[in-house]
């Protein structure tokens, strides 16, 4: 037993003294801990009745490190256990946590602690989405290297997370800007390139003509001007890297049907992808009969009718008319604004080898997000009119049989097939030849990942004048970022300035070549990070397949709803791709999603739109006004930000109220998916403060009852007291059932807290005799503390330390020599699950108890049936017959129906 006492520390040593013949009541002696004079039980051996702010601080100071060390000792290596992978979206290391961070990480921490108590093998990892524009801006503005700025911020934010008492799986920490992570981002990019899913084409960028540099959208103000130079931003075509996400559109759209837990988010994903009814096909381009080496990709919703093509149409804004194409002059000479224009450029279908003209359409906007489409008169009246107007030849390729079946004609090997069969066969053939054929929508675009930035993952491609774009050999990864001494924010891509880094040898021919100087969009880094968490230190591959297959999919993914479209789409894309590469067995990465709401602060705004600080506002009148000018202010609730002067510093509120109080406030103030209006004067904060006080008071009453010198003897309870204890037993089981459901199904942690508050209220009303002699009271009190532990780990740890030292306990199924967070989650007693055939339904009339009647179990939850059952009973006939009943209210949980009667 000695190792047990050593592991559990001071309060266990007190218990040992009692078990070894000490007195049968708690000794209220004060132990002096070197360097501290605390007033809490764990430090002094003396229970204090008062639960003050100082007590809360002392409790959290005492338990903070102990809980952290406790969590670090729990092994994650036992693969025989069922697993639970809870993941909160990792933060950008901006340098300071905000309340939104506190909310999402409090939720994930609470769920992780709960699942550990259920006996699950749990990981709750944390890392840093560390590449990105702010670090580069800081380098320009403050003359700091992005690496230094980022690492400093990570160090500070890690300390902040630690001060919040959050127990992450820190041994799994990842940082996307470190070579040991982005090596594998580059590896996955090369796999995409080899699969034909990464390619280059021209695309528009924001161009600053003064600084001669590309700007991110965030660097362009509302007037279309550069953030630094103030110059009017231009749109310019540059050759950019894309990932062909459209190749997985249909698979990802179909897979949504297998995600029943994605409530609210599935619709957003489906809308982003669009209706996958067609595909893109590739064409080579000729002018005046000469091949140009250029390609054009165009969309059709009816690829089965491709042999009936009359033309390929492009919009007036197409890149061929505005970029660096060799066809630009020929196309522009043919352009007549406002008219459909036939051009001398011919498009050769790479699947069918048909040659058709390119037409510039009069209308600027095509369907969806298209800028090119295939004209097929057999399936489009609009295409028929255009072909006839311009005198274009085409074939009718669809025949309708007498029974209404449509079959193909004049369509090579597809002739005679039904349209449905031809659609499948033709798109499959196109995919096999890598000339298109991926079923997608007319609105989804491929993912542009090029960024003309320094602080991002280098794209592992070498440009050779002989071999063309060539991937860096896998054994030569990572391609690390060169050390650039200064950043000006001007000129071309920063990496282009590092000439020693740019100039290299071609991996194939060994001739002179140049590295790609664009870096990847940071969304690429975060599109696969959930895989790396499963095997974060693997030096040989992004992750081990067997390890990833054990932990994946993520059981619960928590993050802001603002990421419910793009980030989730890209993450799903990477997961589908890795599945097809035989890297993982699961296609979808996330089982359940919890998109938490915002934390909003109150704002005060002048009619001019200027936001005021709270100190500038006069709140003494009926409406807020500007303290100086007395102008009326617009008062709103908005997402917290510095510019709106409505932010709250997490460290300040934790210092003021304590960690557990802020945790409980965040979890109790609103359901996780709803916004929280941050106002500590509302009922939520006083409510959770009162609840902590009630938990403390309940424990005090129990300790005092058992320390009174009287032995607990259940047989001394009267029938009335036994009935009271039975009610507590029923209430406890009901709460266990409902709280467990909230933790596992709907994650309504606010409702879980409400249930626990109800149980604590019921326990508060227990008679002194029940407290002393009833095992039901003891069990319900202990179950309450265990269920509250994931929500408020510090105060419940202290309370459990007090409960553990109570002599002559009646409940043997708790592990009294372990802390509350190491207890097994309470289970509903089997007897409670055996529902009785008859429920004793309490009948109230105008809120006054009038008796009980037996009601069959099968109707006890049906409002109308219980209502009628009561009316036909002897009690109902006697008390309700002939009276005007306005309404009745049924409470199935408490077996009570209340009739409101007109007197």
From Swiss-Prot:
<comment type="function">
    <text>Catalyzes the attachment of leucine to its cognate tRNA.</text>
</comment>
<dbReference type="InterPro" id="IPR001412">
    <property type="entry name" value="aa-tRNA-synth_I_CS"/>
</dbReference>
<dbReference type="GO" id="GO:0006429">
    <property type="term" value="P:leucyl-tRNA aminoacylation"/>
</dbReference>
<keyword id="KW-0225">Disease variant</keyword>
<feature type="binding site">
    <location>
        <position position="642"/>
    </location>
    <ligand>
        <name>ATP</name>
    </ligand>
</feature>
<comment type="similarity">
    <text>Belongs to the class-I aminoacyl-tRNA synthetase family.</text>
</comment>
<feature type="modified residue" description="N6-acetyllysine">
    <location>
        <position position="236"/>
    </location>
</feature>
<dbReference type="GO" id="GO:0032543">
    <property type="term" value="P:mitochondrial translation"/>
</dbReference>
<feature type="modified residue" description="Phosphoserine">
    <location>
        <position position="711"/>
    </location>
</feature>
<keyword id="KW-0067">ATP-binding</keyword>
<dbReference type="GO" id="GO:0004823">
    <property type="term" value="F:leucine-tRNA ligase activity"/>
</dbReference>
<dbReference type="GO" id="GO:0005759">
    <property type="term" value="C:mitochondrial matrix"/>
</dbReference>
<feature type="short sequence motif" description="'KMSKS' region">
    <location>
        <begin position="639"/>
        <end position="643"/>
    </location>
</feature>
<dbReference type="GO" id="GO:0005739">
    <property type="term" value="C:mitochondrion"/>
</dbReference>
<keyword id="KW-0809">Transit peptide</keyword>
<keyword id="KW-0007">Acetylation</keyword>
<dbReference type="GO" id="GO:0005524">
    <property type="term" value="F:ATP binding"/>
</dbReference>
<dbReference type="InterPro" id="IPR025709">
    <property type="entry name" value="Leu_tRNA-synth_edit"/>
</dbReference>
<dbReference type="Pfam" id="PF13603">
    <property type="entry name" value="tRNA-synt_1_2"/>
</dbReference>
<keyword id="KW-0030">Aminoacyl-tRNA synthetase</keyword>
<dbReference type="Pfam" id="PF00133">
    <property type="entry name" value="tRNA-synt_1"/>
</dbReference>
<dbReference type="InterPro" id="IPR013155">
    <property type="entry name" value="M/V/L/I-tRNA-synth_anticd-bd"/>
</dbReference>
<dbReference type="InterPro" id="IPR009080">
    <property type="entry name" value="tRNAsynth_Ia_anticodon-bd"/>
</dbReference>
<dbReference type="InterPro" id="IPR009008">
    <property type="entry name" value="Val/Leu/Ile-tRNA-synth_edit"/>
</dbReference>
<dbReference type="InterPro" id="IPR014729">
    <property type="entry name" value="Rossmann-like_a/b/a_fold"/>
</dbReference>
<keyword id="KW-0547">Nucleotide-binding</keyword>
<protein>
    <recommendedName>
        <fullName>Leucine--tRNA ligase, mitochondrial</fullName>
        <ecNumber>6.1.1.4</ecNumber>
    </recommendedName>
</protein>
<dbReference type="GO" id="GO:0006418">
    <property type="term" value="P:tRNA aminoacylation for protein translation"/>
</dbReference>
<dbReference type="GO" id="GO:0002161">
    <property type="term" value="F:aminoacyl-tRNA deacylase activity"/>
</dbReference>
<keyword id="KW-0496">Mitochondrion</keyword>
<dbReference type="InterPro" id="IPR002302">
    <property type="entry name" value="Leu-tRNA-ligase"/>
</dbReference>
<keyword id="KW-0436">Ligase</keyword>
<feature type="modified residue" description="N6-acetyllysine">
    <location>
        <position position="68"/>
    </location>
</feature>
<keyword id="KW-0648">Protein biosynthesis</keyword>
<feature type="short sequence motif" description="'HIGH' region">
    <location>
        <begin position="92"/>
        <end position="102"/>
    </location>
</feature>
<keyword id="KW-0597">Phosphoprotein</keyword>
<keyword id="KW-0209">Deafness</keyword>
<dbReference type="InterPro" id="IPR002300">
    <property type="entry name" value="aa-tRNA-synth_Ia"/>
</dbReference>
<dbReference type="Pfam" id="PF08264">
    <property type="entry name" value="Anticodon_1"/>
</dbReference>
